[in-house]
Amino acid sequence: MWWVRRTRYWFSTLLYAGGARLRPGRRTASGGLETPGSCGAELQGELDRFGGVSVHLSRHHTLHGLDAAAFRRLLQAAIQQWRSDGRIAAWLHIPILQSHFIAPAASLGFCFHHAKPHSSTLTLWLGEGPSRLPGYATHQVGVAGAVFDVSTRKVLVVQDRNKLKNMWKFPGGLSEPGEDIADTAVREVFEETGVKSEFRSLLSIRQQHRSPGAFGMSDMYLVCRLQPRSFTINFCQQECLKCEWIDLENLARTKHTTPITSRVARLLLYGLREGFDKIDLSMEELPAVYTGLFYKLYHRELPESYKAATGAD
């Protein structure tokens, strides 16, 4: 989809701009030649391949001690230069200890794009028409692990301590930045129950908009099928009220569970009876279009003959 492609482009831009540093004598976004100590004269930035410019205030040491009014004049001059140079957007990265620069930037049209623990990023669209810059992350990702033991036909479930209703559910939690889905499921299961497990497949994906647990944003909740590597329960009493191995058929029938847990339990029951190939989304690592990067692709099992087949076969 168009917004996915555009977001990929701009996020690659952010990653590039965040990792690169201008060296003495390199051409800058202002069009001048950067030399040590020149930052006080003009606000230097880094160009990206889409025609935008990124400015990291943490790299401008001469800004320390500068008042808001002086910074506004400096930024205003830079904006005029960027417009003259045909730049289409500006990204302003402000450390938390320089937050007094946010107000003058906002007075010149900058808006918040996103924030991290120690910095915020503001944007200004300089191109024609409405802004075409993508928003920041639209979803949070939660992952649960359905640890199912085929030999005993039991599945591991918990009851959350801080819920209004004591409903059985699969252990899980939020994925950490840069953490794979499978790793999140295994980690969360161990942290909540003390049971070690191994990833087998992805079973389901739930998307919920305006989620209260995601600060009103959208929430993605993925349930993975895991195979147990240990069976002794030592659950986290801060998070869980109960933790048990429950017969799968009983879990599929009970009313004391969440709708998604009930549905996944029935999915597991179907897989047990008819074959897990009917329900599993397997994972394979493939090379990304970005050099040196890889991604995980989840889909129904594809025969090896089709993996190697060409369009003419």
Swiss-Prot record:
EC number of the protein: 3.6.1.-
The protein's name in its UniProt record: Nucleoside diphosphate-linked moiety X motif 6
Disulfide bonds listed in the record: none
CDD domains xrefs: NUDIX_ASFGF2_Nudt6
SUPFAM superfamilies: Nudix
Keyword Transmembrane helix assigned: no
InterPro entries linked: Nudix_hydrolase, NUDIX_hydrolase-like_dom_sf, Nudix_hydrolase6-like, NUDIX_hydrolase_CS, NUDIX_hydrolase_dom, Pre-Nudix
Subunit structure: Monomer and homodimer.
Keywords assigned by UniProt, alphabetized: Cytoplasm, Hydrolase, Mitochondrion, Nucleus
Localization of this protein: Cytoplasm; Nucleus; Mitochondrion
Family: Belongs to the Nudix hydrolase family.
An example molecular function term from Gene Ontology annotations: hydrolase activity
General remark: This protein is coded from a FGF2 (BFGF) gene antisense transcript.
Signal peptide range: none
Function: May contribute to the regulation of cell proliferation.
Chief location bin: cytoplasm
